Amino acid sequence: MRACLLALLIACGGGTATTSSSGSAAADLDTSGLGKSHATPVPATPDAAVAAGSAAPPAPAPPTTAGYSFRDEAQLLYKIAACGGPESERIPESMGDAILRDKLTKVANRHCTNVLKREAEFRAAYFEKHHAWFAETIPKTIPKTVVYPFGGGDLLSALVAFPDATEITTISLELAGDPRRIKTLDPARLGNSLAALRVEIGGLLSVGSNTSVNLSAQQRNDIPGQVASHLMGLVTAGYEVTDMKYFRLDDAGNVVYIEQADIEDADKKKMKSLKGDWASPTFSEAFSHVEIRYRKPGEPSERVFRHFGWNLDDTNLTKQPQLLAHLAAKGKVTMLTKGASYLLHRPTFSKIRNYMLEHLAWMLSDSTGIPPLYAEPAGMIQETYGSYSGAFLEGSRGTRADRSFVDLWRKNPRRKLGFRFGYVDASGAGHLVVTRPK
């Protein structure tokens, strides 16, 4: 039982780790509160996804005029893999004749019967039942730009906490993935790919967790696992996708959109994973980083989401500093970290930790966030919720960083937390910490 629980909850954290993988953070969203079950709700209207934040309309995202658009592929993945939109529009006429479309529809509908139920249960827990905690705890004046290190596949958690965000960035070892195959999959391959996807998203739509095995496997699926996971977040939160492009960073950290010629050139080269013991991707380097534009139905302005496939340990950030330059240019931002394998506790992740301490205006995390060992000397205040007796992962328990968190909870006032949002502690208790400048 203990081994199974550990496998379910271990997240991957964007660097090199030994006891856990180094990719994305597990979302660890407990849709059962702390052990309580919910009935499947009626799908929420778009407004039901709005929790905390300013009532002012979001600032318009700058238009994109360059780069190859994968809008059509994004729309297909949104409908087929993430199960957004009407069932009658799931398989468009462009995917084949009536007989083929009927077969594809049956495959997609079987998948969506499972996924829509899980999305609805999640929505009931976090956008409805636990809505009040986020609305009351998160200030309305925080920046609308959100950076989520170690957050691969977990746009959903950022949408729960910060529904007014106009720009969200996640970073992890997982590469975004190639969306092109969704247009040509036959019913058998589509069924196999969707079945694999339901396994590979792990507990994203239940306990919000994943394992390194699943995250590695995503990179070999015909359906891009990272993109599909993010689109599930949009569907669950009541958003629609408007465009999707891929990009790279230049030496100064500026976004450069991938053109068709770049894709054709990259397709000739073999791609390696960002972690040595992971399966090699079945797609090219051109599909490492993705930008998805989205909005609520009827909303005039697009919002921007970007996922970076990037190793966040010090060695790699020294070799490839473009990401830090890109992030620093955003100025003060709102931050989120959870399920991050305690990598921010380690001395080998000092560069990303220092960036966070220098640029956070307000941060929400579980105990895998920035420990008081580093936050207090940087002039931060940390407010705790729930209870904490030590790290969930045994290999991170009892370290100086972990003990500083135990001491923080011991000296802080007791604040209740009626749900799980990230890792539990060594005793199975949910907990959260707010970090902000004094």
Task: List the predicted regions and their residue ranges.
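Sec-dependent signal peptide recognition
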Residues: M1-A7
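Acidic, Pro/Ser/Gly/Ala-rich intrinsically disordered segments
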Residues: T16, S22-S24, D47, S54
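Non-globular targeting/processing and membrane-anchoring segments
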Residues: L29-G202, S284, K296-K438
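Short helix-loop boundary/capping segments
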Residues: S206-F283, H289
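Soluble extramembrane regions of membrane proteins in the secretory/endomembrane system
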Residues: S288-Y294
